[in-house]
Amino acid sequence: MTNSIEQAWDLAKQRFAAVGVDVDAALTRLDTLPVSMHCWQGDDVTGFEDPDGVLTGGIQATGNYPGKARNATELRSDLELALALIPGPKRLNLHAIYLESDTSVARNKIEPRHFSHWVAWAKKHQLGLDFNPSCFSHPLSADGFTLSHADPEIRQFWIEHCQASRRISAYFGEQLGTPSVMNIWIPDGMKDTPIDRLAPRQRLLSALDEVISEKLNPAHHIDAVESKLFGIGAESYTVGSNEFYMGYAASRQTALCLDAGHFHPTEVISDKISSAMLYVPRLLLHVSRPVRWDSDHVVLLDDETQAIASEIIRHNLFDRVHIGLDFFDASINRIAAWVIGTRNMKKALLRALLEPTDMLRQLELRGDYTARLALLEEQKSLPWQAIWEGYCQRNDVPVDARWLDAVREYEQQILSQR
């Protein structure tokens, strides 16, 4: 470490030790908590299936910042820079539309070989991979229904797509030695008030059971399902509601995905974690930033991001909660978006690990809510930034906003040529 950072580090460790926090133990734990970065920030959820395709499914990437990745080589290059600017363990989350093939491949015919380059790249960079079927931006999803579609042939197409995706996910886990979390999200819903809310959910229930019917090694693959309140064009009814997927995950013992932007604006997923963990074996978190709706803004180090991290740490949910990010902002440098959001998630985890939780819990058990509030607020002023800077330097990444210099240089030399 540089002298000034080392001095600040030593003083900060003393401050935390005074309130019973072991900084070294906290950093050891932090190094076991990977954050899964989402590949789709790099190209505005376009994928490689149809570069001129239109994004559908009630989601939007707004903006037109130059330098968008146009193929797998460019996307991996951009990711490599972002990964080099973020300390600690990371994973990469892929969608099915990021396959690589010299010929057109129907989505229900995708195979592990179409993702072999991603696996080789992940091995090189010591990354785990996660996966998602892509049930949007496709002619057979154009009317707003996929796994709950009333047409059995269309429904079967999407069932087969999800089944193929599970095999790819298991391939990731087997090849990389760490389980791939495969999350199923579908856009199915209606713009206006439906007459029959039940039948689409019955079809979805049956379709999901068929999707997960093939037994896969849990050391290689984990199933997750994700709810949503509404989307553009599906404002009045969403088939895969919170209640539907909570019941499904609990009854089938799959993982449940909680997306920070998929609930009413007055709801927060940090308050849902402890309840859900009583009924489901695992949680997948999509940490995002909804601004008045599921806008998928870049994650900030704000109250909710911190609350999410604190819930994981306070309740020792390290082995049951998988942390992923889900945002896509096309109005700013896309590499910077990855770096900002992922570093903020890691900062939140570090701050949670540096909290004197045992002390605060004892105050709560004694009913001393005055001291609990006082100390909870005072600990926010403890010098966690000095520990963060030391952690960055230990991991050979820029300590502060100097990472932006590397992004600007890359933008000038590489992105500006696209």
Swiss-Prot record:
<comment type="function">
    <text>Catalyzes the interconversion of L-rhamnose and L-rhamnulose.</text>
</comment>
<keyword id="KW-0963">Cytoplasm</keyword>
<dbReference type="GO" id="GO:0030145">
    <property type="term" value="F:manganese ion binding"/>
</dbReference>
<protein>
    <recommendedName>
        <fullName>L-rhamnose isomerase</fullName>
        <ecNumber>5.3.1.14</ecNumber>
    </recommendedName>
</protein>
<feature type="binding site">
    <location>
        <position position="296"/>
    </location>
    <ligand>
        <name>Mn(2+)</name>
    </ligand>
</feature>
<dbReference type="InterPro" id="IPR009308">
    <property type="entry name" value="Rhamnose_isomerase"/>
</dbReference>
<dbReference type="InterPro" id="IPR050337">
    <property type="entry name" value="L-rhamnose_isomerase"/>
</dbReference>
<feature type="binding site">
    <location>
        <position position="262"/>
    </location>
    <ligand>
        <name>Mn(2+)</name>
    </ligand>
</feature>
<comment type="subunit">
    <text>Homotetramer.</text>
</comment>
<feature type="binding site">
    <location>
        <position position="294"/>
    </location>
    <ligand>
        <name>Mn(2+)</name>
    </ligand>
</feature>
<keyword id="KW-0479">Metal-binding</keyword>
<keyword id="KW-0464">Manganese</keyword>
<comment type="similarity">
    <text>Belongs to the rhamnose isomerase family.</text>
</comment>
<comment type="pathway">
    <text>Carbohydrate degradation; L-rhamnose degradation; glycerone phosphate from L-rhamnose: step 1/3.</text>
</comment>
<keyword id="KW-0684">Rhamnose metabolism</keyword>
<dbReference type="GO" id="GO:0005737">
    <property type="term" value="C:cytoplasm"/>
</dbReference>
<dbReference type="Pfam" id="PF06134">
    <property type="entry name" value="RhaA"/>
</dbReference>
<dbReference type="InterPro" id="IPR036237">
    <property type="entry name" value="Xyl_isomerase-like_sf"/>
</dbReference>
<dbReference type="GO" id="GO:0019324">
    <property type="term" value="P:L-lyxose metabolic process"/>
</dbReference>
<dbReference type="GO" id="GO:0019301">
    <property type="term" value="P:rhamnose catabolic process"/>
</dbReference>
<keyword id="KW-0413">Isomerase</keyword>
<dbReference type="GO" id="GO:0008740">
    <property type="term" value="F:L-rhamnose isomerase activity"/>
</dbReference>
